[in-house]
């Protein structure tokens, strides 16, 4: 996969070189280019914004800068070659991981889009965009080329978004119902959520197959050694060795956490009779944890 990020703060994207994303770069599963938008500014001050038509506070990012930048990055031509190509922040130890040792091959998730597949995907983080979901992350993990446009101030001139549809599949996307200073933080969030689902990035594919939202529910609590810590003990069922009971307990904990934190996720969800009985018990307030 190829990621390109256009921003006025290239240094903000340095975290893309670290941890698993850095390792993915090292393994040639991922390449990342970071482009300074000001390279496409033509005035002496390298300005990228101007006052809004109709008045109002703040500044709007100029189409005369964004248009050429997106044109060049789409085809990696012109000034796009001046962008920084990120290397892994450190050399990682190359040792066999879980899936390699177990002979597990993960083919990846199905792509959501087939039409216009020859066009790169342009993601524009904005509070006015559609909510970013785990389903999006799965679908976009199949993309060959994703370009991020990081807005600032009052955002990017809307004509840039409309014009970009000639060259890109454009998606305006939001990571939550709040406002950030710029799009860079959202890019880090989306990039990490997407890249970790590329086959070979995680050492154990079950790590993301058991994630929150992978089956529509939130993931339940996790525990490790020691069994007792500061007067708190690990639930007995997890040390019982009874895998069927452990699996059922984890399922119920996932249902419980979803009911307590995001009950709307249960609306319309297809549950088996055991799940239905447990959720009904939660609604009535008479379901206790099964720790035995």
UniProtKB/Swiss-Prot annotation:
One of its GO terms (biological process) is tRNA N1-guanine methylation. It comes from the Bacteria. This is tRNA (guanine-N(1)-)-methyltransferase. One of its GO terms (cellular component) is cytosol. S-adenosyl-L-methionine binds at residues 151, 175-180. It comes from Corynebacterium diphtheriae (strain ATCC 700971 / NCTC 13129 / Biotype gravis). It is an enzyme of class 2 (transferase). Specifically methylates guanosine-37 in various tRNAs. Its EC number is 2.1.1.228. One of its GO terms (molecular function) is tRNA (guanine(37)-N1)-methyltransferase activity. Belongs to the RNA methyltransferase TrmD family.
């Amino acid at each position: 996969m190829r990621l390109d990020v256009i921003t006025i703060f290239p240094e903000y994207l340095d975290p893309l070189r670290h941890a698993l994303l850095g390792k993915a770069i090292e393994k040639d599963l991922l390449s990342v280019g970071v482009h300074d938008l000001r390279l496409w500014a033509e005035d002496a001050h390298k300005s990228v914004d101007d006052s809004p038509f109709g008045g109002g506070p703040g500044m709007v990012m100029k189409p005369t800068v964004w248009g050429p930048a997106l044109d060049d990055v789409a085809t990696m031509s012109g000034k796009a070659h001046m962008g920084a190509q990120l290397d892994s922040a450190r050399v990682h130890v190359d040792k066999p991981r879980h899936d390699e040792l177990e002979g597990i091959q993960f083919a990846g998730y199905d792509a959501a889009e087939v039409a216009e597949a020859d066009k790169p995907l342009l993601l524009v983080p904005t509070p006015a965009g559609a909510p970013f979901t785990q389903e999006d992350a799965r679908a976009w993990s199949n993309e060959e080329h994703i370009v991020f446009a990081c807005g600032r101030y009052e955002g990017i001139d809307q004509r840039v978004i409309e014009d970009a549809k000639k060259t890109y599949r454009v998606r305006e996307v939001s990571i939550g119902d709040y406002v950030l200073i710029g799009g860079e933080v959202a890019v880090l969030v989306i990039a990490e959520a997407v890249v970790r689902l590329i086959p070979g990035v995680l050492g154990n594919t079950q790590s993301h197959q058991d994630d929150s939202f992978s089956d529509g529910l939130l993931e339940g609590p996790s525990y490790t050694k020691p069994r007792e810590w500061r007067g708190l003990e690990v639930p007995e069922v997890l040390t019982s060795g009874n895998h069927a009971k452990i699996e059922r307990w984890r399922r119920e904990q996932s249902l419980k956490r979803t009911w307590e934190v995001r009950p709307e996720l249960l609306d319309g969800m297809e549950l088996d009779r055991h799940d239905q009985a447990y959720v009904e018990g939660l609604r009535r307030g008479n379901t206790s944890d099964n720790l035995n």
